[in-house]
Each structure stands twice: as C-alpha cells, then as structure tokens.
Amino acid sequence: MGKVNVAKLRYMSRDDFRVLTAVEMGMKNHEIVPGSLIASIASLKHGGCNKVLRELVKHKLIAWERTKTVQGYRLTNAGYDYLALKTLSSRQVVESVGNQMGVGKESDIYIVANEEGQQFALKLHRLGRTSFRNLKNKRDYHKHRHNVSWLYLSRLSAMKEFAYMKALYERKFPVPKPIDYNRHAVVMELINGYPLCQIHHVEDPASVYDEAMELIVKLANHGLIHGDFNEFNLILDESDHITMIDFPQMVSTSHPNAEWYFDRDVKCIKDFFMKRFSYESELFPTFKDIRREDTLDVEVSASGYTKEMQADDELLHPLGPDDKNIETKEGSEFSFSDGEVAEKAEVYGSENESERNCLEESEGCYCRSSGDPEQIKEDSLSEESADARSFEMTEFNQALEEIKGQVVENNSVTEFSEEKNRTENYNRQDGQRVQGGVPAGSDEYEDECPHLIALSSLNREFRPFRDEENVGAMNQYRTRTLSITSSGSAVSCSTIPPELVKQKVKRQLTKQQKSAVRRRLQKGEANIFTKQRRENMQNIKSSLEAASFWGE
C-alpha cells in the first residue's frame, strides 16, 4: 500500500482495463476469481486474456493466488486505484496526479489537477490496514453481510463521505466543496491551511474554541454527531477559521450511544486547547442543549437511524393542516377551487334528481320535479306555466311509451330476414296447394287449425310496419349487444400432454446450459492445463539434468 505510481496508466490499453474490470466484477462473489470466469466476463474481441493477465500481474495491479482447492486472481489496491483514476480522467475531473499530502489509518491524500490546472484534493480510502482491523465491529458499512472485501468497504466509506460532504456543503457548513467520486476515491476542494495538530500558536484561542464548540452544536441540531471531532480532522486557515474534514464515522443523534459520542467530541477539544494553548473554559455544550432543527441524519442515512425510528417519527409528527394544503396546491395542474367543486356538485346532483323523477313519472308514480335550487324556491308559479309544464310532461310520457313499444317490436327485428324467408316459403306452398286443387282458405283447414289462420292474418296486417325502411329506422334505437353464441370461439387442443411438453423444454434448456458451461471452461482452462504441462516438463528436465550431473 505505498504511493500510487501512475506512470503506467497512460500506456494501458482498452483490453487491459477491460480485463481489470472483469476481475473487479468477479470479486463481487469470489475471493479468488478463476481465469475461466475472467475470460468469459471480459470477452475480448481478439482473445489473449491470459497474456493480459500476466502483464497485469507483472505490474502488481492484480495478484495470482493458488490454494489447495482453487487458483485464480484477485484485485489489488493499485489496480483499484487505476480503475478509479481512469474513470475520473474520462470524466475530465482529474488530468494529473501530484504529491502525497497525508497518510492516515483510513486514507491517503494526493494533490490532483484538471485540464485547466485547477488543483483539488484526492482522497483514496484504505480500509483494512494493520492499525484499523476492527472496522467490521465498529462500523456498520457491511450491515448484514458476514464476509466483505476490504475494497468494497473502502468504496462504501467513500460513498458515505461524499454524501455527508455534499449535504453539509449545501447547508453552509465549513467543509470542503465536493467535486466528484468514483469507487473508493473522492475529489474535493483543496483547502489552503494546516491541520490544527500542527499549529502551536494562535492569536485568539478563545474564538477558535468557541467556533469549534458552536460547530459541534450546529451539527447536533441537524441530527448528526461527528464521532471523531479532534485536532487531526480540523484545518485552520490564515484567518483562523475552522474547516471540518473526515466524515465517514458520523452517527445520528438517535443512536443509542449518541450522548457518549457527543461528550467525547467535546472532551477532545477541551483537552487539546488545555494542553496546546493552556486555555480552559467553563462553558461547553452538553447533549441536553441540542434543539433539533433539521433531519440531516435521515437524508444521508446516518449510523444509528433505523427504519423503525423513521416510522416512529412519522407517527409522532404527522402532517398538519398546513402541510396538507401545500400538498393539495402542488398536487396537479387540473385541481379545482372549492367554489368550482361545489357548483359542479350541485349541477350533477340536480341532473341526477331530474332524471330519477322523470323515470318515476314514466312508471306511473307521480313525484314533483326537484330541479335547480332557484326552481325549488319559485313555488308561486302562474297557471299558464303550470299547464305548459304538464303538457310537456304528457308529451314526454307519450314519447317514452312509443319508445317502449318500439323496443318491444325490436326484439323480433333481428329475426326479420328469417321470418321473411319463411313467409315467402309459405306463400309458395299455398300457391302449390291451390294449383293442386286444394284451396288455401278451405273450411277443412279452418276447422283443423283456426289459430294459424288468425296469426297469418295478423302478420299481414303488421307487415307494412316491418318492411326494410322501418327496420333501418328502428335499428337506431337498438342497444347493440354481443350474442353469446356468436362470440364463442373454438379453443385448439393439442394431442401432446402438457407434462410431456414441459419435460422436453426443460431437457432442452438444461442441455443448452451445459453446453455453454462446457465451452466456457474449455476456452478458459486450456491454457491452465498447458501451464501445468510445462511445469511438469520443466521438473522432469531439471531432474534429468541433476541425475546426469551426479553420474547416475
């Protein structure tokens, strides 16, 4: 974990980064990634994955490891640095890398610059060093996971720090301006100052002390506790103003041990000013002095703030009438005012009541029409208007009865063509009977079937009302419905049982998967067997040379 050597970064090709990314993707669920899996993930256009792997191992961007059961590659910190720097350079954030400014137990800090020559600070998180091995017990980065890579934990730490820095910078806290981040690298503003631990003289230590204590209280009022607020994470500029850095260990004020973390931060500042500047003050904040102003811990999901606490907060602090009004105003573009809604409700209710009253009157039940509210108030109407209204209602009832009669007659309209054909056939049969000497209207047939003769006469009487012209007019009032018999569809049935079809499809898919795995293994493991064969030949050759040397 030495300094980042970026000299080889400019000479790396696209295939090199493709293979390096394949190793990173394989390490999501592998501690040691097999070469066959790397070859299948990289899928180089012209092949040669193992040659690229050997070059990356030579430059210590990946490491070759071999155990009793598996053999493969793993990504190193240098390779992870190269991937992050490549992405930042493609975004035109980082163009050049300078000297190393500082080394800590969790990170390394470098000076970088963009194309315009503007300098920034690059922080590379290095979790898992010898002096910081209890991170999995002290931090909740891994959450419910049991086995997590240190590289992945470094990435989570960088994501948390960038989220904290962005939220604090937007709320005017004295923190560096966040620029960008990728994987475990965070690019931020370069502060022109010195850490407080390197300063031995201050003109006014009381003002610096007060500013530090106010910053602790301001953080707590926003729902956060720094957790590591000491002289190593505070930068003092030329005007003796404090800038706060290093945020991954921040916790929420809802944490069970929040008061202990708060008192520890206060004690660190008190002890430092007493030792370094011989300044002691009786005024210092306590955890009871916190007045909650913001929910920054909810926004950035700080440690100690769980989903259960969020649900409890929603129950304890429900939305008030002001919040509901704001939501209704911002709801949609098609919202109506209260007056418009009331008018529309009155019109809709009056229309429904008038329709209901008309239907009751058509059925024989007299009910007074309840029109608009203005019509209800006008009870003293003249006799002429009452007669006109009753005349209109009688006309309306007559129209309803005519429509009902047409609907009853329309029930037989659908069979008009069939009955027409039947009547024509009956007429032909009657003509044949008359030609055969049997009169159509003879007394014998009248005595045998008198009701049939009556029906035929009735049909002839109503026939003028069932011609083609009237049928077209009556079809306008028909309600078109789908016939059950006509809408039925025949379902095609297969002679092969469905169980047999499922078995065949499953067998075919299994065969395809096995063939794909076989091709991948053959493609990736061929060179591994070649390497083993070369090692065996080398051992045999060396043993033969030793035997010839001793004269055996």
Swiss-Prot record:
Phenotype when changing residue 216 to T: In a renal clear cell carcinoma sample; somatic mutation
EC class: transferase
CDD domains, alphabetized: RIO2_C
Pfam families noted in UniProt: RIO1, Rio2_N
SUPFAM superfamilies: Protein kinase-like (PK-like), Winged helix' DNA-binding domain
Modified how: Autophosphorylated (in vitro). Phosphorylation at Ser-335, Ser-380, Ser-548 by PLK1 affects the timing of the metaphase-anaphase transition.
EC number: 2.7.11.1
Effect of residue 380 to D: Increases time spent in metaphase
BP GO annotations: maturation of SSU-rRNA; positive regulation of ribosomal small subunit export from nucleus; positive regulation of rRNA processing; protein autophosphorylation; regulation of mitotic metaphase/anaphase transition; ribosomal small subunit biogenesis
Domain Protein kinase residues, every copy: 97-272
Keywords: ATP-binding, Cell cycle, Cytoplasm, Kinase, Magnesium, Metal-binding, Nucleotide-binding, Phosphoprotein, Ribosome biogenesis, Serine/threonine-protein kinase, Transferase
Domain of life the protein comes from: Eukaryota
Record-level GO cellular component terms: cytoplasm; cytosol; nucleoplasm; nucleus; preribosome, small subunit precursor
Compartments in which it is found: Cytoplasm
PTM annotation (Phosphoserine): residues: 332, 335, 337, 350, 362, 380, 382, 385, 390, 412, 417, 442, 548
Chain positions recorded as ATP binding sites: 123
SMART domains per the UniProt record, alphabetical: RIO
Keyword ATP-binding: yes
Reaction catalyzed: L-seryl-[protein] + ATP = O-phospho-L-seryl-[protein] + ADP + H(+); L-threonyl-[protein] + ATP = O-phospho-L-threonyl-[protein] + ADP + H(+)
Self-association and partners: Associated with late 40S pre-ribosomal particles. Interacts with PLK1 (via its N-terminus).
Described purpose of this protein according to its UniProt entry: Serine/threonine-protein kinase involved in the final steps of cytoplasmic maturation of the 40S ribosomal subunit. Involved in export of the 40S pre-ribosome particles (pre-40S) from the nucleus to the cytoplasm. Its kinase activity is required for the release of NOB1, PNO1 and LTV1 from the late pre-40S and the processing of 18S-E pre-rRNA to the mature 18S rRNA. Regulates the timing of the metaphase-anaphase transition during mitotic progression, and its phosphorylation, most likely by PLK1, regulates this function.
Family recorded in the similarity comment: Belongs to the protein kinase superfamily. RIO-type Ser/Thr kinase family.
Name of this protein: Serine/threonine-protein kinase RIO2
